[in-house]
A protein has these predicted regions:
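Helix-terminus/linker motif at the lipid-water interface of multi-pass membrane proteins
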Residues: 33-51, 121-128, 184-191, 253-280, ...
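Transmembrane helical elements of multi-pass membrane transporters/channels
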Residues: 19-38, 140, 151, 174, ...
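Hydrophobic residues within alpha-helical transmembrane segments
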Residues: 22, 26, 57-60, 100-104, ...
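Small-residue-rich hydrophobic transmembrane alpha-helices
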Residues: 51-111, 148-167, 274-338, 370-392
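Hydrophobic transmembrane alpha-helices of multi-pass small-molecule transporters
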Residues: 63-66, 178-183, 208-212, 283-287, ...
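N-terminal transmembrane alpha-helices
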Residues: 9-46, 59-74, 78, 82, ...
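Short runs within selected transmembrane alpha-helices of multi-pass transporters and secretion channels
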Residues: 72, 140-159, 170-178, 196-209, ...
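Short alpha-helical transmembrane segments in multi-pass integral membrane proteins
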Residues: 1-21, 79-146, 188-243, 300-366, ...
Length: 446
């Protein structure tokens, strides 16, 4: 007998919560994996200098794409709340207007990225040997920013529409497109970093255009795309509510730039390459926490809108325990896989492999607390409290990490760079706990 579909209005057990969030977890993990494929192909088929070049400009690319996460997560919280209040038609209009806004903003940012890439590469500290790869890869990828943003927006809205499995299908289709084209353009056609960039851009078109077609046509989801005029208030509300996700993205990117600057100063290109490997693996591991946060957010928003306080308590209690179990599991897994994963990326260079493996074994302790911090920030976004969510993200991903990256190398040498993220997660854990306690009476989740 087939299992009944899960509704936002349901009471959630551990099993039902995992079943509902699993598609978004898989979606985020798969998105991270196919992003990692770029790094694997560039490192193994093009070389470590082009690999370092790609990693150097990646933070800027992610900042632009992060606008889509802001609109998607903030907009989903708003639309899910409207659905919980029974305002179906207003939810349709708001959803449609936010998709239109994403397209327009994405087109503008694509143009900005293409025009400013040489200056951006210089600002990020690219060496003369890295400059051509930085500019070529960066210009091509940022040209597809509109598609990247759409893909990020629809990842969240598929969940609010009660179609998380369809969202997973679209992500898998985009991922397979990227992997196949990477192999074709880099390994067969020998197009180098340009091939990696084109493969990524075309896969983002798949991830952004397929959902657009689905929501434009008659469908069985909770949401429809309809003609809509831009309205400032819901745009600002969505952007403000999703600002924590944008802040997290921007902060991570800025901190990535700071990491690269410190590593170029202390080690050189090998340090940037080693950090690139850590980031690719972190993308996959942290994607599990982000996917859970994205998947559970519409449920929290719905029950908040419906004033189901007992269900909010249930969701918070179960989620905190799941994040703790996930943190321990991923930390152990990262310790075990440090050497094999390092070998997969940079096994062709003995000294770089040794550096990466050592860094990995220090860096991996950050996974213990990352899940709790990511979920707490997303939880407040789902409660339509963008200010608290943004504060947690800002402190966690920028203030604490930047401070640690600057201070710890003075105390611990190069190892201080690899310990920095763990120190930041410890401080963020304290702040997240304080906010949960302070806001408990307002939202009745404890």
């Amino acid at each position: 007998m087939a299992k009944q579909s899960i509704r936002l209005s349901d009471h959630f057990t551990y099993g039902k919560l995992l079943r509902f969030t699993l598609p978004s977890i898989c979606m985020m993990v798969f998105t991270s994996i196919y992003g990692v494929v770029d790094g694997l192909f560039v490192s193994n088929f093009v070389g470590k200098t082009p690999f370092a070049a790609v990693n150097l400009v990646m933070p800027f690319v992610m900042i632009l794409g992060g606008m889509g996460f802001m609109i998607g997560t903030g907009g989903t919280a708003l639309v899910s709340k409207l659905l919980g209040e029974g305002k179906q038609e207003e939810a349709h209009r708001t959803f449609s207007m936010l998709v239109l806004f994403t397209l327009l903003l994405g087109a503008v940012l694509s143009a900005v990225g293409i025009l400013t890439m040489p200056a951006v590469a210089r600002l990020l500290g690219a060496s003369e040997t890295m400059m051509p790869g930085c500019v070529l890869y960066g210009r091509i990828v940022t040209g597809f920013t509109f598609a990247f943003m759409l893909q990020n927006v629809f990842q969240s809205f598929f969940i609010a529409a009660e179609k998380p499995r369809l969202g997973l299908f679209v992500t898998v289709a985009a991922g397979i497109t990227n992997m196949v084209l990477d192999a074709l353009f880099i390994a067969v056609f020998d197009w180098g970093v340009a091939g990696a960039a084109i493969a990524t851009g075309l896969s983002q078109c798949v991830g952004g255009v397929l959902p657009l077609i689905y929501f434009l046509r008659p469908n069985t989801s909770l949401l429809r795309l309809r003609p809509a005029a831009l309205r400032l208030r819901p745009i600002l509300q969505s952007c403000g509510n999703g600002s924590s996700e944008l802040m997290s993205n921007i902060s991570s990117s800025l901190v990535g730039m700071l990491y690269n600057f410190q590593l170029m100063r202390l080690i050189g290109e090998d340090g940037v390459s080693a950090y690139g490997v850590l980031m690719y693996v972190q993308f996959i591991f942290v994607a599990i926490f982000i996917g859970y946060s994205i998947g559970s957010a519409p449920v929290v928003s719905f029950h908040y809108g419906a004033q189901h306080h007992s269900e909010l308590k249930n969701l918070l209690r179960k989620s905190v325990l799941l994040m703790a179990i996930g943190g321990v599991t991923l930390t152990v897994l990262a310790r075990v896989l440090a050497a094999p994963l390092s070998r997969l990326f940079v096994g062709y260079d003995a000294s770089l492999y040794a550096l990466t493996t050592h860094a990995f074994r220090l860096f991996c302790w950050s996974f213990l607390l990352a899940g709790f911090n990511i979920f707490t920030s997303g939880f407040f976004t789902a409660l339509n409290n963008g200010a608290v969510s943004a504060a947690i993200s800002f402190l966690r991903t920028l203030v604490f990490q930047a401070g640690s990256v600057v201070v710890l190398p003075i105390l611990l040498g190069v190892d201080g760079i690899w310990w920095a993220i763990t120190a930041a997660e410890i401080f963020a854990f304290i702040i997240s706990g304080v906010f949960l306690v302070l806001k408990r009476n307002k939202y009745h989740y404890m």
